[in-house]
Amino acid sequence: MDKKELFDTVINLEEQIGSLYRQLGDLKNHIGEVIEENHQLQMENQHLRERLDQSDRDKSSETENDSAQKPGHSDIGEGHDNLARLYQEGFHICNVHYGSIRKEGDCLFCLSFLNKK
């Protein structure tokens, strides 16, 4: 190999290393985003599980205390109240984005669902 071929080979390797470095940086950024999203989803999942457990406990204590009430009428009102509470806590209750966190204020789909009679 003469000096020019050796120099061209080194330049080619340098370009490949630069390209790999950029790809590695992009991959690192993507992994960071995925880890952050995973953490948010885990927190949201835990929060929803706690809410579900609390709702189940409330429902079981309510049925024990109010066994003489009509279950059909109270279940409809209670479900609506639970959805309204979830909406006030910042979660979507509409069929479009159900369960995801509301980020930009009120959702028209959720509000129309809450206002149905």
UniProtKB/Swiss-Prot annotation:
Metal-binding listed as a keyword: yes
Annotated segments matching region Disordered: 45-81
UniProt keyword annotation of Metal-binding present: yes
One term under GO cellular component: nucleoid
Name of the molecule in the record: Replication initiation control protein YabA
One Pfam assignment: YabA
Function: Involved in control of chromosome replication initiation. Inhibits the cooperative binding of DnaA to the oriC region, thus negatively regulating initiation of chromosome replication. Inhibits the ability of DnaA-ATP to form a helix on DNA; does not disassemble preformed DnaA-DNA helices. Decreases the residence time of DnaA on the chromosome at its binding sites (oriC, replication forks and promoter-binding sites). Tethers DnaA to the replication machinery via the DNA polymerase beta sliding clamp subunit (dnaN).
Homology family: Belongs to the YabA family.
Subcellular location: Cytoplasm, Nucleoid
HAMAP family, per database record: YabA (MF_01159)
Lineage, top ranks: Bacteria, Bacillati, Bacillota, Bacilli, Bacillales
Named cofactor requirement(s): Zn(2+)
Binding site for Zn(2+): H92, C94, C107, C110
